[in-house]
Amino acid sequence: MRDLHTAGRAAIATALAAACLPVAPASADVFDGRIAFSSFRVDPPAGMQRSGDIFSMSPDGSRLRRLTTNPENDRQADWSPGGTAIAYSIRKPDSPINFEAARMTAAGTGHRRLTTTADPQSSSQPSWFPNSRGLLLRRSGPGLASSIWQMGTAGQNPELRYQPPNPVLYPSFSPDMKKIVFTGVVSPEGDTDRAIFTVDADGGGLTTVFDVSGAYDSAPVWSPDGRHIAFESNANVDDRNPEGELEIWTMESDGSDVRQLTRNALHDEGPSWSPDRGRKIVYTSGPDDLNGDINVMTATGRHLRVLQPHEGRDESPDWQAIPAPKTARRCGGVSSQDIRDVRARGIGMICLRARSLARRWAKAGRPDEIRGFAVRTKDLGGTTRVVMTRRSILGARQLVAFLDESG
């Protein structure tokens, strides 16, 4: 999901070159971190417009944290690739519809507006470059007029990236940064017909990857490996959605192998993949635009579960990717100690021993060293990444890595 003249050309060329730098492979190991989302559960003060704030929670819906606390409308959170920061949209003061792009840390500190867009224009729906060196965003004007822009992570060097033939929403780079996916409004008048497009990073090769006439095909998001796209649509394909409700779908990145994952009388929208191999999809589901909960299911549409059920509306979930050391074994968790996703590597480092070390570390008060293992920790907004290492007698490095949810 979403000014140019001669003096700025050097900066523009530099930014474009940075956008094409190689990125880490999508298969790099990551943990599934926290889920950030917008929520309208907090009532605005008397006389203020109804607005939302950004929260985060653990993948099971526990350990809820409120990350923004202001009377303006904070929406469309997007985690940085390293899981340390969140870009989001913040409504301009005294405006019901116009937004600016902003960012904050994973813990909800260091709030900073990145754009200052002259009225009646708006800058919204920021999404990180996969190499963390910039942000795409939607720049819009009166009505539906809009285009794809890019800027640095501090808001520097804003520039037009791509001007599509139709109004645009929810732009984002593929993991290898070779393509941009986005929603295009294709209805002759108003916003009643949307389609999903991809375009090459250089602005060529515009391709329609999903378009059902008269349907609302929107909110595309890349899978971690870039092979698939999840999206929302109210299309009635093969009479599988006769009521025309918004449902969650997936497809190959070229538009083939289209699959409808949800099928119910609710509005299912705004999907996001779990970072660790894209095995799950999180999304919003509710009876109408004023009510909705964050749900999670497998990437095949099974084992659906509601996270944080409550009255009101939660929307636009995005799943934090926490970098993880490469390991040979995935060992589960230690639920009694708030430890999950234990991973092990090294000679003699079997899962039983890895979980035992994690348990002992937690019971010992989470020290910097335990049983000869050096311990490094990093807090990422309430979830702590823990890495334990030491050299064995054979010189090979033994390693235990996991997430600690006790914070």
Name the predicted role of every residue range:
Residues 325-360:
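Extracytoplasmic/periplasm-facing segments of secreted or lipoprotein envelope proteins
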Residues 92, 139, 285, 333-338, ...:
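Short acidic, glycine-rich loop/turn motifs
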Residues 26-325:
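Sequence signature of WD/YWTD-type beta-propeller architectures
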Residues 2-28:
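Secretory targeting and sorting signals
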Residues 345, 353-407:
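Extracytosolic low-complexity repeat regions of secreted or lipid-anchored proteins
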Residues 267-286, 348-371:
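Short, positively charged, low-complexity/disordered linker segments
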Residues 23-33, 377-382:
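Short, surface-exposed loop and linker segments with low hydrophobicity and enrichment for Pro/Ser/Thr
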